[in-house]
Amino acid sequence: YSNLSLSKVKGRRSNIKITEKCDIEMLSNFLNRSGIGFDLHRYEDGEGIILGGFKINCNYKIVAHSDGDVLLHSIADSILGASGSGDIGLFFSDQDQKNKNLDSQKIIDYCLDILDKKNLEIFNIDTTIICEYPKINPLREQILNKLSEILKMPVSKIGLKATTSEQIGIIGENKAIAVQSLVNLREKL
């Protein structure tokens, strides 16, 4: 092999090489853990619903053991899943009377404490609210701002979308609301 000649090859910054142990540590900052959350609740006659900690005045409420915040429940499940901690029912059973009418912000606080203990943080969240009513776009900024406050993260790292189910099924008949969420976690920097 002593007769081989050396040459320089143009590299790419996106091709991260691992030569030393510190390269692996640096690369781990780019790796994340993902979790998916989903929640669905029925409506009944009432005086409003809560989405992402934001109170929406309307002529119905969400049927639930807690305050029925489907958005926070979905996000909580995605956080718990990504952190390998189980699901919302494991910590906040609907069979336990102490969780009756529970403020869902307390569920998120609990999830954030778990992340802190595991030295993890939320990198970003993406959510989709699925309902016929209320219309989410006129309320989007208020919901985003409340989520930012509750999750202690900038609005720019929270995706909030809404869609209908095209008048199909229980959601399409305006008898229920659902939320699907994806969270990406990473080790704290």
Task: Indicate where each model-derived feature is located.
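Glycine-rich, mobile lid/loop segments that gate access to catalytic sites or pores
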Residues: 147
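Generic structural marker for isolated residues within well-ordered, non-membrane alpha-helices
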Residues: 144
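RNase III-family endoribonuclease catalytic core
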Residues: 22, 29-141, 151
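Short acidic capping loops at alpha-helix termini that bridge into adjacent secondary structure
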Residues: 154-157
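Glycine-rich phosphate/pyrophosphate-binding beta-alpha loops
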Residues: 17, 165-166
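C-terminal edge-of-domain segments
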Residues: 171-189
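Conserved alpha/beta core of the MobA/IspD/sugar-nucleotide pyrophosphorylase nucleotidyltransferase superfamily
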Residues: 1-35
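Pyridoxal 5′-phosphate
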Residues: 160-164
